[in-house]
């Protein structure tokens, strides 16, 4: 398993992943399918944004199997978004990829916002050094401050 920075040619793969049912169902901000035009605009903006870092997770054969995105949305934290294809889950790949990505960036404060219906993601972030900051009826907010 390896991670690499996104390239322009990754746009279609990310578009396909973001519109998968298993991805949409756990999104906090938008659970509707995204059209390619809106995705292309978003992708171009993210590629040119110094406050965003996106990594493609590849298997040992260099086939893309997921992505990790860090995006600064608040002064103090970079929000974490992870997607891993279904057949690669529960193998420790996401934990390894997250740690690799964290070690490649100069960010020190991370935040994960998780829908309460997504207990698996909540447990994943706890297992990977995040702690509960606060919660409401619909979501948990976990943070990890690297020292």
PLM feature spans:
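Conserved GNAT acetyl-CoA-binding A-motif
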Residues: 105-116
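Acetyl-CoA-dependent GNAT
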Residues: 32-81, 85-87, 136
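Conserved acetyl-CoA-binding loop-helix of GNAT-fold acetyltransferases
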Residues: 84, 90-104, 119-127
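Conserved acetyl-CoA-binding loop of GNAT-fold acetyltransferases
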Residues: 126-136
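C-terminal "cap" of GNAT-fold acetyltransferases
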Residues: 135-147
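A short, well-structured alpha-helix characteristic of acyl/acetyltransferase catalytic modules
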Residues: 4-33
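Hydrophobic adenine-recognition pocket in adenosine-nucleotide-binding enzymes
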Residues: 6, 84, 114
């Amino acid at each position: 398993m390896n991670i690499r920075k996104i390239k322009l040619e990754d746009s279609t793969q990310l578009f396909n992943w973001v519109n998968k049912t298993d991805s949409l169902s756990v999104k906090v901000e938008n659970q509707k399918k995204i059209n390619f035009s809106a995705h292309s605009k978003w992708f171009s903006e993210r590629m040119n944004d110094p406050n965003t870092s996106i990594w493609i997770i590849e298997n040992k054969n260099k086939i893309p199997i997921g992505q990790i995105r860090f995006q600064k949305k608040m002064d103090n934290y970079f929000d974490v978004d992870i997607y891993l294809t279904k057949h690669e889950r529960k193998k420790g790949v996401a934990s390894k990829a997250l740690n690799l990505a964290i070690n490649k960036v100069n960010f020190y404060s991370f935040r994960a916002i998780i829908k309460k219906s997504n207990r698996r993601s909540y447990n994943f972030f706890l297992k990977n050094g995040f702690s509960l900051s606060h919660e409401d009826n619909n979501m948990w907010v976990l943070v990890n401050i690297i020292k």
